[in-house]
């Protein structure tokens, strides 16, 4: 069956809800503090990611849809960081600034793939005047195909009933990711998307699928909902609608590494698909496929159109092969969570020969996963001259990715991969030739993180330069 993705580029979605900033501090720890019996973390990497309703908006934008985000923030660096991060991924922010409150921020400190502590910076926004939120919704209703209300019980949706009524009056479907057990607040919504535990907290424990359907249909009637989608983890999803047979969809997840933010992905894909003009059943099909992709990633993540297309066509992304830098970071984090040793090397790899193959096979034997970082065409030209590369970057990466020894291939634009290596921090950095370890780009960063640096020998008689010279001589002859 041929599956066509929705026309996401024509979809407009507004997300209103509790926005927050997720901060991550990473670093090694090798000693206990003399001040208290706690580990000392030497922070060497800091990451900031939009969370809560902001992650829903990112999921919508990652599909190519037009995403607008409305929420409450403080007037602080966290709000500015959120705005910048979201603007970078084409989310249009229209925050209501509340000078008396901080932007909700969650700071996590991690070392050796373990979260040591989480610090929350927040004050509930209950009691804040909701009128500015209502005004922003009203202004957008004529230009959107769906309204998402993302509830994390932080106060932005204190007036959720008024928001539902505004959208329904304009004929715009309202999708809500609920929080808590008071579903009366969501009366009249188009679709609620509770997970199974949230659903059972309202209707009671369900022993069978039939009980889920029976109690779900009663909930729809009690709260005048148009539909209910219960996400059931490894058992997939169940869509319930009045007058229609239940639609049960099995999970499409190949491997589950992290369910963080999966609900955000589901409601984001649902909204974008509906706003593109597809049916609710089709929206659930695509949302289920997207959930299967995102739980295979570490941390709050989004799904690209290519990943979604692969998933719905039965070619779910394996998490290996040619990757972007951001995709690689997620793949490496997942590998470390599985206890795998990550090896990294780099080079031009212009005309792949036996020496390259032997070298990469030997490098792979030193760990569980091998990353190959490849010079871009411009970088290669600067290093090797105007006649190089012979093979363009895309072809070089595809050939490398086809080798059994290579797990991940990524490119870099600079003359050296030092910045890239500093961002990945492999357990083992490998380089071929007659280098000294301290001369290798990225060695200082790897050592500082507790990793190793090793020089491997190349096979004698194998050289790209010699191959090119031989080809040129043969042409002359």
UniProtKB/Swiss-Prot annotation:
EC code: 2.7.1.167, 2.7.7.70
Gene: hldE
Assembly information from the UniProt record: Homodimer.
Modified residues (N6-acetyllysine): 179
Domain of life assignment: Bacteria
Enzyme category, top tier: transferase
Keywords (A to Z) from UniProt: Acetylation, ATP-binding, Carbohydrate metabolism, Kinase, Multifunctional enzyme, Nucleotide-binding, Nucleotidyltransferase, Transferase
A Gene Ontology cellular-component term: cytosol
Listed NCBIfam families: cyt_tran_rel, PRK11316.1, rfaE_dom_I, rfaE_dom_II
GO-annotated molecular function: ATP binding; heptose 7-phosphate kinase activity; heptose-1-phosphate adenylyltransferase activity; phosphotransferase activity, alcohol group as acceptor
Family, per entry: In the N-terminal section; belongs to the carbohydrate kinase PfkB family. In the C-terminal section; belongs to the cytidylyltransferase family.
Role description: Catalyzes the ADP transfer from ATP to D-glycero-beta-D-manno-heptose 1-phosphate, yielding ADP-D-glycero-beta-D-manno-heptose.
Binding site for ATP: 195-198
Region spans: Cytidylyltransferase: 344-477
Active site: 264
Pfam family, one: PfkB
Catalytic reactions of this protein: D-glycero-beta-D-manno-heptose 7-phosphate + ATP = D-glycero-beta-D-manno-heptose 1,7-bisphosphate + ADP + H(+); D-glycero-beta-D-manno-heptose 1-phosphate + ATP + H(+) = ADP-D-glycero-beta-D-manno-heptose + diphosphate
Record-given protein name: Bifunctional protein HldE
Ribokinase: annotated segments: 1-318
Pathway(s): Nucleotide-sugar biosynthesis; ADP-L-glycero-beta-D-manno-heptose biosynthesis; ADP-L-glycero-beta-D-manno-heptose from D-glycero-beta-D-manno-heptose 7-phosphate: step 1/4; Nucleotide-sugar biosynthesis; ADP-L-glycero-beta-D-manno-heptose biosynthesis; ADP-L-glycero-beta-D-manno-heptose from D-glycero-beta-D-manno-heptose 7-phosphate: step 3/4
Annotated PROSITE patterns: PFKB_KINASES_1
One BP annotation, GO: ADP-L-glycero-beta-D-manno-heptose biosynthetic process
């Amino acid at each position: 069956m041929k599956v066509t993705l929705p026309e996401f580029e024509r979809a407009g979605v507004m997300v209103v809800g509790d926005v927050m900033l997720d901060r991550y501090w990473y670093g090694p720890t090798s000693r206990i503090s003399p001040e208290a019996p706690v580990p000392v973390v030497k922070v060497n990497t800091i990451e900031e990611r939009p969370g809560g309703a902001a992650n829903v908006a990112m999921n919508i934008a990652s599909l190519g849809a037009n995403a607008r985000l409305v929420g409450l923030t403080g007037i602080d660096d966290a709000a500015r960081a959120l705005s910048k991060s979201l603007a970078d991924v084409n989310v249009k922010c229209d925050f209501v600034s509340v000078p008396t409150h901080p932007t909700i921020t969650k700071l996590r400190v991690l070392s050796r793939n373990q979260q040591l502590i989480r610090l929350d910076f927040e004050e509930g926004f209950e009691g804040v005047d909701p009128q500015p939120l209502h005004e922003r919704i009203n202004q957008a209703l004529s230009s959107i195909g769906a309204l998402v209300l993302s509830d994390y019980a932080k106060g932005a949706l204190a007036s959720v009933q008024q928001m539902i009524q505004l959208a329904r009056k304009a004929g715009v479907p309202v999708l809500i990711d609920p929080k808590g057990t008071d579903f009366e607040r969501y009366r009249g919504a188009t679709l609620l998307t509770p997970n199974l535990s949230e659903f059972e907290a309202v209707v009671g424990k369900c022993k069978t699928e039939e009980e889920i359907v029976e109690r779900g249909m009663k909930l729809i009637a009690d709260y005048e909902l148009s539909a209910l989608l219960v996400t059931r983890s490894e058992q997939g999803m169940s869509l319930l609608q009045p007058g229609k047979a239940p639609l049960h969809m099995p999970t499409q997840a190949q491997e589950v590494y992290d369910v963080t933010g999966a609900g955000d992905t589901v409601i984001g894909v649902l909204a974008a698909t509906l706003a593109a003009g597809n049916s609710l059943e089709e929206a659930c099909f695509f949302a289920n496929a997207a959930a299967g992709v995102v739980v295979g990633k570490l941390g709050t993540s989004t799904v690209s159109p290519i990943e979604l297309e692969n998933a719905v066509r039965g070619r779910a992304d394996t998490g290996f092969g040619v990757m972007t830098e951001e995709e690689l970071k997620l793949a490496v984090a997942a590998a470390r969570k599985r206890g795998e040793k990550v090896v990294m090397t780099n080079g031009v790899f212009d005309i792949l020969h036996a020496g390259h193959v032997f070298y990469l096979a030997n490098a792979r034997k030193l760990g569980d996963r091998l990353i190959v970082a490849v010079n871009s065409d411009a970088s290669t030209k600067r290093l090797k001259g105007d006649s190089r590369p012979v093979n363009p970057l895309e072809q070089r990466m595809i050939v490398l990715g086809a080798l059994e020894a290579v797990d991940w291939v990524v490119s870099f634009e600079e003359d050296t991969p030092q910045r890239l290596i500093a961002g990945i921090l492999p357990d083992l950095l490998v380089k071929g030739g007659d280098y000294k370890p301290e001369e290798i780009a990225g060695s200082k960063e790897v050592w500082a993180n507790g990793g190793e640096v090793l020089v491997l020998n190349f096979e004698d008689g194998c050289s790209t330069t010699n191959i090119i010279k031989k080809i040129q001589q043969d042409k002359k002859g």
